[in-house]
Amino acid sequence: MKKQIILSACLFAAGTLSAQYQIDLKNISYPKVEYIKMGNPGPAGQEIKVNNLYLTEGGVPQVPVMGEFHYSRMDPRYWRDALLKMKSSGVNIVATYCLWSLHEEFEGELSWKDHLNLHRFVELCKEVGLKVHLRIGSYCNAEIRNGGLPDWIVGNHNFRARSNDPLYLEYVRRWYEAVYSQVKGMMYKDGGPVIAVQLENEYVVSGQIIPHLTALKRMAVEIGYDVPMYTMTHWLDSEYPKGEIIPYAGFYIEAPWTTSGKNEVPVSNFEFFTYNRLSDNIGTDIIKIEGDVESLSGENNESPFFTCEVGVGSTTFYPRRAVVPEELAGENINLRLGCGANLMGYYMYVGGSNPVGQKRTYQSSGPRISYDYQAPVREFGTLGTVMQETKKYNYFMNDFGPSLAPAVAYLPTSNQKRENLQWAVRTDGKSGYLFCSNILYRRHRQDFKNVRFTVKLKDETLRIPRQRITVSDKAYFLWPFNQSLGKTLLKYATVQPVCSMKEGNETTYFFFEDDGIAGEYFLSAEGIDKVETVHAACKKEKNGWFINALRPGKDCVVTLNCTDGSIVRLVTLTEEESDQLWKGTNNGEDYVILTTSSLISDGKKITLIDEQSSAEAWIYGKGQFKKRTFQGEPRSLKATFRQLAPMDGAKAIRSVAGDLVCRGFYLNTIAEVEKAWLRYVADKQSYSMLNNQKVQAEEMGGYWRADVTDLVKAGGNEWAFSAPDGVMAELEILLSNGQRVIWNTDATWTSSDKQSVVTDCNLNKPSIFAEQEHLALYAVNVPDALQGDEETRAYLSYKGDVANAYLNGALIGDSYYDGTDWILSPSRWKESAAVNPLIVRIQGLKSADEPIYFEKDIHPADCVNPSLTGVEIRQEYRFPM
């Protein structure tokens, strides 16, 4: 009896497992496809049209790849390079915010020059071969002050901003007209690159969404924005102008705005396969359940699942300093595709630097300057960790988009139990892709053993793979089934597709084996004459060819000699090699190259980019990779730095007659005084006067310090000391526009009777800042950057809380400490730091218990007393191929 009970339990468990990994799509109805009326679709043969499921270009379904890049946050000399990096990594569309506050800091003073030259930016996009999605506001967010609304709009009490107040709409009309004047004649219908316009952003005023967005669209159309797509972000609410505007979704897994203190970001529904596009409980009206399958409700699905803010990197907020790992990108993209996303829009794809206004800096919750976002292309042109995973999926969407776009997502209802293995199927009823995710960001999942997926289609049942497998913690993947590869049919594969490459009558498909799951292919016998394998085993069976025992690598090649004379090759790479893959078109021909370097192609030449003086690339052609090496002339550039003492530039002075010493200073600025500190060395009886107010100073151990923020003013200032035995002092002023101003005691001071002061007094200058200040300053001499395209970068290693870099008093860079190197680019500085040093000001943590999230390898106690530990200069090398 006991044995019988055990056997029954085993059979029950096996049955439960089988049910969990089974999806029955035999009787599922495919949603009706209906096109949405937008603006002019563009030139004949290239029309961009959108239906309730996907986008077509020239009648061909596509899964476009869109990346966010803010032209106003980058030196325009580097726009082209960043755009080429986007295109070379598989991006098709550039999304960009037009940030009103940067263009019109003061009412009536619009600027379109330099980094604000929108017209030139859009021209460059066209030259490079990228389409443009304008996000014209008026409100944008973008982690910028007021979300991009100018202060003079926010402060205008004659209307309510972000409403249908007629006066506000007139201001918006004026802004829309100003933007349009820069892109007139550049719409897609004109042969230009502008294919879409986003109206407003994150507008969630209940009851006002439809009327306000409709009013903005009507205005934009009247002005001349005639484009294939009008869009909006669709956050937190299910109402939107259906049939008028396409809603876009956003998905951030690392989201610093969702948590505080040292807590991890909470797990959200975004980390599971789900149809809920907006939040945990909204957006369910488009879902229907048939049997054990969750799918789209064709009757209620009126818009495609498009995204504009899929976070593969993350911004940094002061309380949260997370460093995103490579797998963050792969996890998020894989989940979005498995849930049915048909436009992949990344935010951000290219990092940048906030410009500085005349009155203030423009940050919202992050650093004042840095908007690096840990993006695939980072603030100063280096590639982010997440680029490796991101570009693999980009190439997949580029090359397999025509078969992926019409494939509807079907989710087993077992996914609703979050502890179960998460998986999904996208299919048009015959072919498709199987997606699986067993990863949670910064958390562990169990390993799932004895997994084999069963997909029941109308005409057949697929069981993938042949032998049960273990899906380990952190695994995520997508597998194809019933996909046409040239004239052959791939019944299924347990390796992930990346891209394809055509060479005459030969086509190569590139896959990679990942996550400890053995790769296998099963191909229909039809259309194949002979199969040849290298580093794989092949068995001819009744219904096809079974290929397994793969040894992934550059030489793992399966060659299919087809009955029509064509050749199809399947190359199975390792995961590491797939990270190195670059795919593109050069001089009209496809290329696939493996390299650890960065790579760009302008369509005529391919260039490798590296911070080492040598590089190598493996170039694919005719079934094999061939290695090429490149060698540049090594260049050794060195930086020097020294720690600055308090009052580093001050001289000790005293009055000839023993009375007051004084000096007038003029603070020539329209910015506000954000912080001002007085530091001085003198005896206890001495005191300071600032603008006729006696300063209350605190002894810091070696010097006196006072917070004089409320005493310093724009314009004329009078500063005096009563110090018969002499004084040495500095006044450090930090302005709201990022400027740092220092006034020192020196020989230009006078006594109260206008006699010159003497500088022969002996005072002990402190060598370091007092412990209570948690402050360290350094003068960094950086060699002049080399001229040309090859960028020179400085990598600063430091410990502390917040670091700021000043060049001749102007703030040029900043960093919230997160344990990684702080990168700056001397190539982008408008002045040299070889003679006039860069001043690096590092503020330490007030205590080791500050409620700030750091990575586990950071010890906050080490950040209380700040320090700069190294400055490394790295020179970029470019190798034409």
Regions found by a protein language model. Name each.
Residues Y171-L236:
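Active-site neighborhood of glycoside hydrolase catalytic domains
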Residues V204-Y225, T233-T274, S353-V356, Q416-Q422, ...:
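Substrate-binding cleft/loops of secretory-pathway carbohydrate-active enzymes
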Residues G108-L116, S138-S163, E170, E177, ...:
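Aromatic- and acidic-residue-enriched segments that line the glycan-binding/catalytic groove
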Residues Q20-I93, C863, Q875:
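N-terminal carbohydrate-binding accessory modules
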Residues W79-R145, K217, V221:
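Aromatic-lined substrate-binding rim segments of carbohydrate-active enzymes
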Residues T214-T231, T274-Q363, D428-G429, L440:
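Catalytic-core region of carbohydrate-active enzymes that cleave or remodel glycosidic bonds
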Residues Y21-D24, G39, M387-S688, Q693-E698, ...:
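Non-catalytic C-terminal accessory domains or segments of carbohydrate-active enzymes
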Residues N117-V128, V132-L134, H157-V194:
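An active-site-proximal structural segment forming one wall of the substrate-binding cleft
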